């Protein structure tokens, strides 16, 4: 169906307005007749009733009140076979008529029933039923003509910007394809993009008119949708974690990494940092903080984009099952995964649903908790058990009557105790030889997931502690021993130079020195109070040991009481000296000479008294 610019009726504030008086063409009478007959012209209805302030300009292009459909009586009977006016025939074709429809608008067919309903009831957005045409009184020819021009569904939202939904289908935002982050949440503004408008032009009739000078009415709507998404995310994840972003120069590229504010497992950060360093996931420039939900959405987007294109039917079904399992445990990435290592290889784990995430993302997962194959008794005791199986074996062996099983349980328990750091030198050697040069992977140790890489034959762990957020020279930490005392390096794996003393905060350094001295004094005091067990003979009886302990306790008590008496004597001497000094200060200024002579006589007496008090307060040990 085609229409002229004069027949446009913007639905603003719920009232359909027609062209202004005096602006009608020579065929205005024909338009009024067809409006009265129920053959409404095609009009463009905005998606929002409020608009952006330009609706008044469009409202001024209105028909006289007598020509308005609201004022036209409903004429029952058959409708006109003419679908509308032809712009080419009427000579009213304008350059704007050939343009594509504006974003935020779609074409509807106005009928007298719709116009009358719009007068009494406020029309909502384009998705409301009030803005939809009532085709009950139209003929089959008009239904056919209007069917090719109707929008897809109420609201007009789709998960794809360039592929609008076909007519009659209702796209769902809850589908798997709409799993996007907050910055790319599909809104009506993105759905009605220029690319989508170009794709929709061939579907509509040529010469379709648009509002000249109109502006898309989707900015306010997009802000409202974003606010709704943020409110929904807060309800879904109350008290969610917020992470700070550190920007580094990684291979001459300004690359972000996610830092961790609390010490915990959080495999989500390790996985996202691998994807960020590989430039498979990109964040907005100079972004400083990000929420856990946003990280999950970025990860979900990447998992959907990484779906293989050409696979067989069996592989597709297997991939979909793995994707479903991964989505089910995706929320665990914020707190921790159930990873069960085996002590036979750096990439050998007991298969759990949590491992599917690493398989789908194609991120290697390593550990270094291996048994040295040269120690036969440990190899026999541990065998091919995983960590959980080994713990169960130790418990069962301890309760067994077989001495050999008890011995194996004891050896296995000793192995776990001696390798509490969950990294052995044999495992470190295997890691160094297995990890490829420049490979980005995840390293599991002590229930913690770290981003790891290999540079010139040396393993490095990414430093994600938030305390180093502003330290540009601290990016990687070398992994060259099992004690965890690696060296800090910058983004180019250069050792961190020592800090300039002038740049060190003096107050902070003084506090560190005081804390160190306090700890040292406490350590010395504790060592002085401890009993030297090496000096006690091995054959001593319990009675003699008790006597020695009692003597040590008596010595400590006497030392404590001596310190208390000395402190009390010093306090008494100080108070006496203060009382004697007050009369001397209260002497009149007129008798300065006599006062000075008296003070000179009193000074040796006071010194003698203090010496006598010190002698009396001394305790002979």
From Swiss-Prot:
Site residues (Ubiquitin-binding), renumbered to this chain: 542, 545-546, 549
Pfam families: MINDY_DUB (PF04424)
Gene Ontology CC annotations of this record: nucleoplasm
GO-annotated molecular function: cysteine-type carboxypeptidase activity; cysteine-type deubiquitinase activity; K11-linked polyubiquitin modification-dependent protein binding; K48-linked deubiquitinase activity; K48-linked polyubiquitin modification-dependent protein binding; K6-linked polyubiquitin modification-dependent protein binding; K63-linked polyubiquitin modification-dependent protein binding
Active-site residue list: 266 (nucleophile), 448 (proton acceptor)
Disulfide bonds: none
Ubiquitin-binding domain (UBD): annotated segments: 507-559
Residues annotated as signal peptide: none
Biased composition (Low complexity): 145-163, 558-591
Domain of life: Eukaryota
Enzymatic class: hydrolase
Function: Hydrolase that can remove 'Lys-48'-linked conjugated ubiquitin from proteins. Binds to polyubiquitin chains of different linkage types, including 'Lys-6', 'Lys-11', 'Lys-29', 'Lys-33', 'Lys-48' and 'Lys-63'. May play a regulatory role at the level of protein turnover.
Alphabetized PANTHER family for the sequence: NF-E2 INDUCIBLE PROTEIN (PTHR18063), UBIQUITIN CARBOXYL-TERMINAL HYDROLASE MINDY-2 (PTHR18063:SF8)
Official protein name in the record: Ubiquitin carboxyl-terminal hydrolase MINDY-2
Organism: Homo sapiens (Human)
């Amino acid at each position: 169906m085609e229409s002229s610019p004069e027949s446009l009726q913007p639905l603003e504030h719920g009232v359909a307005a027609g062209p202004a008086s005096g602006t009608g063409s020579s065929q205005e009478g024909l338009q009024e007749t067809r409006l009265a007959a129920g053959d409404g012209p095609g009009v463009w209805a905005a998606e929002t009733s409020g608009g952006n302030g330009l609706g008044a300009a469009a409202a001024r292009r209105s028909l006289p009140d007598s020509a308005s459909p609201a004022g036209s009586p409903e004429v029952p009977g058959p409708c006109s076979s003419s679908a509308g006016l032809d712009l080419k025939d009427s000579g009213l074709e304008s350059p704007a008529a050939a343009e594509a429809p504006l974003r935020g608008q779609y074409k509807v067919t106005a009928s007298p029933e719709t116009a009358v309903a719009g007068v009494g009831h406020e029309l909502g957005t384009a998705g409301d039923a009030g803005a939809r045409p009532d085709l009950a009184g139209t003929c089959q020819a008009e239904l056919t003509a209007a069917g090719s021009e109707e929008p897809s569904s109420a609201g007009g939202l789709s998960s794809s910007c360039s592929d609008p939904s076909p007519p009659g289908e209702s796209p769902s935002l809850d589908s798997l394809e709409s799993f996007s982050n907050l910055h790319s949440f599909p809104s009506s503004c993105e759905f009605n993009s220029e690319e989508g408008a170009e794709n929709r032009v061939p579907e509509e009739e040529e010469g379709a008119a648009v509002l000249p000078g109109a502006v898309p009415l989707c900015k306010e709507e997009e802000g409202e949708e974003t606010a709704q998404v943020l409110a929904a995310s807060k309800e879904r994840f109350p008290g969610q974690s917020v992470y700070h972003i550190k920007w580094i120069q990684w291979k001459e590229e300004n690359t972000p990494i996610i830092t961790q504010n609390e010490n915990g497992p959080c495999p989500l950060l390790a996985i996202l940092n691998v994807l960020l360093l590989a430039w498979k996931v990109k964040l907005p420039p100079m972004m400083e903080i990000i929420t856990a939900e946003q990280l999950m959405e970025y990860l979900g987007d990447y998992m959907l984009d990484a779906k293989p294109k050409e696979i067989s039917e069996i592989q597709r079904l297997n991939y979909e099952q793995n994707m479903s399992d991964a989505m089910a445990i995706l929320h665990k990435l914020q707190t921790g995964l159930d990873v069960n290592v085996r002590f036979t290889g750096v990439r050998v784990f007991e298969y759990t649903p949590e491992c599917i995430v690493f398989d789908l993302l194609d991120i290697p997962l390593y550990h270094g908790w291996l048994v040295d194959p040269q120690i036969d008794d440990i190899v026999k005791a541990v065998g091919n058990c995983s960590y959980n199986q080994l713990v169960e074996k130790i418990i069962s062996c301890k309760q067994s009557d077989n001495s050999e099983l008890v011995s194996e349980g004891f050896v296995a328990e000793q192995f776990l105790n001696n390798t509490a750091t969950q990294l052995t030198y044999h495992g470190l050697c295997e890691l160094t030889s297995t990890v490829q040069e420049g490979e980005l992977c995840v390293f599991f140790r002590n229930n913690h997931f770290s981003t790891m890489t290999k540079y010139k034959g040396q393993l490095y762990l990414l430093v994600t502690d938030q305390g180093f957020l502003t330290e540009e020279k601290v990016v990687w930490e070398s992994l060259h021993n099992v004690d965890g005392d690696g060296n800090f390096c910058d983004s180019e794996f250069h050792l961190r130079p020592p800090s300039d003393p002038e740049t060190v905060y003096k107050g902070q350094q003084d506090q560190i020195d005081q804390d160190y001295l306090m700890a040292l004094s406490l350590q010395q005091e504790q060592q002085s109070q401890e009993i030297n067990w090496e000096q006690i003979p091995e054959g001593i009886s319990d009675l003699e040991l008790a006597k020695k302990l009692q003597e040590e306790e008596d010595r400590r008590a006497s030392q404590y009481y001596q310190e208390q008496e000395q402190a009390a004597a010093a306090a008494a001497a100080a108070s006496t000296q203060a009382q004697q000094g007050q009369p001397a200060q209260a002497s009149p200024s007129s008798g300065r000479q006599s006062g000075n002579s008296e003070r000179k006589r009193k000074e040796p007496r006071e010194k003698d008294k203090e010496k006598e008090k010190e002698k009396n307060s001394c305790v002979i040990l």
